[in-house]
Amino acid sequence: MTAPSKTSASPVDPSPHVAAAHDKILIVDFGSQVTQLIARRVREEGVYSEIVPFNKAEAAFAAMKPKAVILSGGPASVLDDDAPQAPLSILTAGVPILGICYGEQTLAKQLGGIVEGGHHREFGRAQIEITDDCALFDGVWEKGGKYDVWMSHGDRVTQLPEGFRGVAKAAGSPISVIADDARKFYAMQFHPEVVHTPDGAKLIRNFVRKVAGLKGDWTMRAFREEAIEKIRAQVGSGKVICGLSGGVDSAVAAVLIHEAIGDQLTCVFVDHGLLRKDEGKTVVDLFRHHYNIPLVHVDAAKLFLGELEGVSDPELKRKTIGRLFINVFEGEAKMIGGADFLAQGTLYPDVIESVSFTGGPSVTIKSHHNVGGLPERMNMQLVEPLRELFKDEVRVLGRELGLPEVFVGRHPFPGPGLAIRCPGEITAEKLEILRNADAVYIDQIRKAGLYDKIWQAFAVLLPVKTVGVMGDGRTYEYVVGLRAVTSTDGMTADFYGFEMSFLGAAATRIINEVKGVNRVVYDITSKPPGTIEWE
């Protein structure tokens, strides 16, 4: 995605259509790489949460009026002269506060405690011992018990602020959890939001439900109703165009917008010839025949494959595909005529990634949407009905809207499509081999009942041929690589541990059923050091 344009709400502006209707928690971001996980854990409790950089938090707090605040972790040291701080207006607002890692340290220091640089740094799995009871531990941890947590810190609290007591300790931090029951301030040196702290979600649940007293009334049904109202208010009698990619995000956005404004929406589906087997037909059938949404289907395969001929560099592939997509989409949009708005399936992580925790431009802005840049070129305003949602929430909304499970639950698919699953030069022959191999592999996974247990699975056509023997003859054909990973957010991933019998059966089917392949390998690289996709 490009940085949000002037037609889009600021990434740190509280979302207006949820601000008045539900209990909310504000998450003050100090730069942790896992701050998004805090928001997800809170939302799992049915409570709406938003992330804002620490230097935007005071204004966001005043506008959002949250019922509680969470201070995130971060890479800085509170001992630095220019260390980020939580706004004093938030600390004195009378709302419950939970500090995590750096959030604990700055909370303690700002309230009069002492934080020192640790001689014993803690990174990774650690064990804490509960020394006293507190509301966070209710029904989860008991006094005297020892529990696994995930630490990532150098500094530590050595003297408590007035009103606080220490309720847990660890080898590298004798005060690992602190509590001020009167003010409902709690903080911990470890990270409860990550899966490596087994009971972390339960601790966050206790803060949300028992400490803050929030009932959790934010549901996808409520979001759907409020989003429809917002779309109608924004669009009025105007026309909207939406680019469909074949993925879940744009599909859910299109169905939601169509429910709000009907045939004021026209979808444009550019088939660049790099989709999975029968994917173009699936998209057309779903939107044109099942939902009766006005749809322009553009078969641009020859154009894209012609421009990609001889291109082997993966970044040049991406740029070529992006440029062509924009050109084709823009041409179709002009032919439709009269559109005032451009719809995009922007998600909340896209919004967060466009602004760093200091409030300035982020070092890396991910280009998630092929239509980035079109609003300015075509003088259209953006409609982004999913910009407050995470990927898993979009799937829930899709089910709420009645999209078929086979569509909603499908694995992520990259914008450049099969182009980045075919390292080296792309040809129509290679794409056909790859499509067929991928279809057999996914079919085998579904038949084994494993599809929903895997974050993403796909086949890759390697740019090499190997010698083989089939029947009584020698073959010299392509190698197919199989990839399957487990993940919660795609930021990190582990390879899926198939049984050898499964891999053997999948390889046999691919070699027997897909012409042009005589060897199959399985990729057991995790992320990091590798990436999920090969290019």
Curated annotation (Swiss-Prot):
Record carries keyword Manganese: no
EC number: 6.3.5.2
Reaction it catalyzes: XMP + L-glutamine + ATP + H2O = GMP + L-glutamate + AMP + diphosphate + 2 H(+)
Family matches, as Gene3D superfamilies: 3.30.300.10, 3.40.50.880, HUPs
Binding-site list for ATP: S245, G246, G247, V248, D249, S250, A251
GO molecular function, one term: ATP binding
Active site: C101 (nucleophile), H191, E193
This protein's UniProt keywords: ATP-binding, Glutamine amidotransferase, GMP biosynthesis, Ligase, Nucleotide-binding, Purine biosynthesis
Gene Ontology, cellular component aspect: cytosol
Alphabetized InterPro entries for the sequence: Class_I_gatase-like, GATASE, GMP_synth_C, GMP_synth_GATase, GMP_synthase, GMPS_ATP_PPase_dom, NAD/GMP_synthase, Rossmann-like_a/b/a_fold
Alphabetized PROSITE patterns for the sequence: GATASE_TYPE_1, GMPS_ATP_PPASE
Pathway the protein contributes to: Purine metabolism; GMP biosynthesis; GMP from XMP (L-Gln route): step 1/1
Glutamine amidotransferase type-1 domain mapped to chain residues: 24-217
Protein role: Catalyzes the synthesis of GMP from XMP.
Complex formation: Homodimer.
Name of the protein described by the UniProt record: GMP synthase [glutamine-hydrolyzing]
Species name: Rhodopseudomonas palustris (strain BisB18)
